[in-house]
Every structure is written in C-alpha cells, then in structure tokens.
Amino acid sequence: MRIGLFTDTYCPQINGVATSVNMLKKGLEKKGNTVYLVTVNPDKYEYSIEENGKVLRLPGVPVKIYDYKLASVYPLKAINIIKKWKLDVIHSHTEFGVGTFARIIATQFGIPLVHTYHTMYEDYVHYITHGYFNWSSKKIVEYLTLFYCDKTNTELIVPTVKAC
C-alpha cells in the first residue's frame, strides 16, 4: 500500500506527534508498505525532498507557539510531487496547514482520508489566552475541532478515552 502521512511536526522536532508519526512510519514500512511523508521544513523557508523522495518538507512561517511553523494549505509545488506518489490512502496528523492540505488533496484526487486527533486543544487554550476568555476560547476550540473532524474523513482515530 502507498500511504501518505501529513503532519505539521516531524523529526528532528521533539514532541508527541512527531514521535507518534515517526513510529507509525517505521511500523508501516516494516509491514511492507511504501510510506511518504509531507511536513513543514523546520529550518528554512523552502521546499526540500529527503529520504529518496519519500519525505517532502514544505516552507512554513514561524508562529509564536513552541518551534511550530505553519505551512500553506495549498502549496502548489507539492501537488505534482504528491500526484506522482499515487497514494492509496492519506493519513493526516494535524488540523492546521498540512492537515488542511491533506483534506484538499484527498478530495481533489479521490483518495480515502484517515485522521488522527492527537491533541486536546481546549486543554492548551490558557497558554494563548493567559487566562482571559478561557471559557469562550475553549468553546470555540471545541466547535472548530468538531467541524474539522466531522468533515471529509473516511476514518477518525482518537487515541485517548478523554478525547471521545
């Protein structure tokens, strides 16, 4: 099977999503699958292709949360590369730039989309609001999460009981 993993964070970044995606990639490859990965370039604002053409890094702009970078939701240069991969399934691991791009590509090319919901964002709202508007911010985040997760997913994976 030809699987495309789409994520905003990946090695060399150190966080739970990057680690989960890396472990999933290795496990799928061990089972004989061909795994491609689309992620944000953590170092430079440019495209790069690594691991014999199987990892595509997109340009991203820094945001003020951790070492996070946000990619375009429709990076034109990436489309032809991904089209050549002839993916059987797309598995997104983010609700932001690269995840939205995964949804668009899945719809555009008629590829089944699986999404893993890794982060309980309402538990992190206080880092951004600094205690102001916590209740309303949590409600907005809950709504946006439901909106995102209910749309265009063939399958939704929620790895914690709390998230159900």
Predicted regions and their residues:
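Membrane-proximal helix-turn-helix segments that form the acceptor-binding/catalytic region
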Residues: 108, 137-155, 163-164
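An amphipathic, basic-hydrophobic alpha-helix
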Residues: 60, 64-89, 98-104, 108, ...
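An aromatic- and histidine-rich active-site surface loop
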Residues: 45, 90-123
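Short, hinge-like loop/turn segments at secondary-structure boundaries
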Residues: 52-57, 108-110, 131-135
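N-terminal subdomain of nucleotide-sugar transferases
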Residues: 1-59, 82
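Acceptor-binding helix/loop patch of EC 2.4 sugar-transfer enzymes
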Residues: 60, 114-147
